[in-house]
């Protein structure tokens, strides 16, 4: 659907082998994130595609690099690249609090939230209420729900276009 034909490695600035926070993986593997590299790689990919989605790692407050030279959070990368944000959250118990706090953090730090996607969505009273409460408390629409095993994202094309505006 996306029409991407190149290797994943050509779309990534950094890919760590250790399944830990990026700052820790970088320290373990001796390959810290350089923001100029990230910016150059993003600009290169953006020239090739009309729409580019950047997947975050660990949430907006995730440390990307944290050492004597630099203290970089994911929010710094989002701001540097002038990205809009989508919040992806588990649909289950505890998500109202987690999503509301995440949206407030993003807004309070000068970024825009374009939508919310609920992951591991199975429906039912709790998850349906979670969705309604999240929209009510944040004013941000839930634009999609992803069920376990889904291979495609069901989202209205006009809604998706607004994410990239």
Predicted feature residues:
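Anionic group-transfer/hydrolysis microenvironments
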Residues: 57-58, 92, 121, 149
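Switch II (G3) loop of P-loop NTPases
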Residues: 38, 42-70
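Inter-motif core of Ras-like GTPase G domains
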Residues: 67-91
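Structural motif
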Residues: 53-55, 86-88, 117
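N-terminal phosphate/diphosphate-binding loop that engages ATP/GTP or pyrophosphate donors
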Residues: 1-32, 36, 41-44
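Charged helix-capping and loop-helix junction motifs
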Residues: 66-75, 100-103, 127-132
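C-terminal lobe/tail of nucleotide-utilizing enzymes
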Residues: 104-165
């Amino acid at each position: 659907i996306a029409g991407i034909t190149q290797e994943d490695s050509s779309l990534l600035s950094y890919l760590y082998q250790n399944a830990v926070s990026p700052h820790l993986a970088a320290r373990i593997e001796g390959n810290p994130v350089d923001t100029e590299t990230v910016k150059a790689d993003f600009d290169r990919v953006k020239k090739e595609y009309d729409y580019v989605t950047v997947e975050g790692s660990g949430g907006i407050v995730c440390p990307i690099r944290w050492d004597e030279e630099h203290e970089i959070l994911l929010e710094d990368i989002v701001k540097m690249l002038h990205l809009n944000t989508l919040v992806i959250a588990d649909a289950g118990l505890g998500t109202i609090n987690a999503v509301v706090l995440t949206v407030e953090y993003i807004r309070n730090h000068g970024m825009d939230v374009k939508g919310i996607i609920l992951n591991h969505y199975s429906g039912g009273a709790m998850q349906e209420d979670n969705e309604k409460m999240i929209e009510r408390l944040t004013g941000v629409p839930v634009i999609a729900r992803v069920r376990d095993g889904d291979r495609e994202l069901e989202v209205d094309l006009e809604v998706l276009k607004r994410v990239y505006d």
